[in-house]
Amino acid sequence: MTLKLADRVQETSTSPGGTGTINLSGAAPAGFVTFSTGIGSGNATYYTILDTTTYDWEVGIGTYTSGSPGTLSRTTILSNSSGGTSAVNFTNGNTLSVFVTYPAEKSINYDIDGVATIGDVLGYSDKIGRAHV
């Protein structure tokens, strides 16, 4: 399985309730693409699920599977609106916005001097002659 990221991937879902697999609508809002187009079946991705009524949310790693409907399996929860790392029990019948994201804890950031921070480690500079370990 490949971890794949893509810009502007979003679909909605009507929550079945619970903490299991999310059934996606198969349609993307204007200006977005579907998981099928952007991620592809069998690939993992970072995602956010937002309950548009209660504003509960979770960020995680999931696997998209095409079908009727396409589904997103919630494999690893990285964070949620309660401050934990467990799957959110979304309210049955609520509309969910499901989209690809790049979690802050997984990002690599360059400071103003061009030094990369990976987690709590400084280690790489894209400027010639500077390296920090």
Give the role of each language-model region.
Residues T14-P16, I39-S41, T54, Y64, ...:
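A generic structural signal for short, solvent-exposed coil/turn residues
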Residues A27-P29, D51-Y55, T65-P69, L78-N80:
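Acidic glycine-/aspartate-rich tracts in secreted/extracellular proteins
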Residues V33-I61:
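Ser/Thr/Gly-rich low-complexity blocks that favor extended beta-strand/coil architectures
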